């Protein structure tokens, strides 16, 4: 594995352990040239999946983009990185095991909302505000009231 610090092509694995609920392997590596230590994650990729956007553009499924969106929604909310990793890994597994080469971005958005609803209601509303394109304060109020009603049931 190439060192991110000096770009040398050789590194040794110093520690290896399961991560993300056994969906990945976390490896601590050390560069044999500069001695820098860094962490890598190894994940199974079942198939290449294309995401179909609302404007009909297509792009490869990008786990890091999904993780970035979830992390942004959960910022300053007390949601652990482990919870975020589990949610993202679960969504990635659903996307890859769906048996289709393409998936609508709206379907992924619904998966994220379902997961966030169970983790943190504020993160859920934050994500929904972007995903559903809230344009006024009234949109937030209406959505928040539906979340509160659902919580009572």
Curated annotation (Swiss-Prot):
Cofactor note: Binds 1 zinc ion.
Name of protein: Transcriptional repressor NrdR
Record InterPro entries: ATP-cone_dom, NrdR-like_N, RNR_NrdR-like
Organism: Erythrobacter litoralis (strain HTCC2594)
Lineage: Bacteria, Pseudomonadati, Pseudomonadota, Alphaproteobacteria, Sphingomonadales
Family that this chain belongs to: Belongs to the NrdR family.
Cofactor or coenzyme needed: Zn(2+)
GO BP terms: negative regulation of DNA-templated transcription
Domain ATP-cone: 49-139
Record keywords, A-Z: ATP-binding, DNA-binding, Metal-binding, Nucleotide-binding, Repressor, Transcription, Transcription regulation, Zinc, Zinc-finger
GO molecular function, one term: zinc ion binding
Zinc finger residue ranges, unnamed: 3-34
Keyword Cytoplasm: no
Record keyword Cell division present: no
Function of the protein: Negatively regulates transcription of bacterial ribonucleotide reductase nrd genes and operons by binding to NrdR-boxes.
HAMAP family tied to this protein: NrdR
Record-linked Pfam families: ATP-cone, Zn_ribbon_NrdR
Tree of life domain: Bacteria
């Amino acid at each position: 594995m190439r060192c991110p610090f000096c770009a040398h092509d050789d590194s040794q694995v110093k520690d290896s352990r399961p991560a993300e609920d056994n969906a990945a392997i976390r490896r601590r590596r050390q560069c044999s040239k500069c001695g820098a230590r860094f962490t890598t994650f190894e994940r199974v990729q079942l198939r290449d999946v294309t995401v179909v956007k609302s404007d009909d553009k297509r792009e490869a499924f990008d786990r890091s983009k999904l993780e970035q969106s979830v992390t942004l929604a959960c910022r300053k909310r007390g949601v652990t990185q482990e919870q975020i990793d589990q949610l993202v890994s679960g969504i990635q597994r659903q996307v890859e095991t769906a048996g289709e080469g393409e998936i609508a971005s709206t379907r992924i958005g619904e998966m994220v909302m379902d997961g966030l609803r169970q983790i943190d209601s504020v993160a859920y509303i934050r994500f929904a505000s972007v995903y559903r394109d809230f344009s006024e304060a009234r949109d937030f109020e209406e959505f928040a009231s539906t979340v509160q009603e659902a919580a009572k049931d």
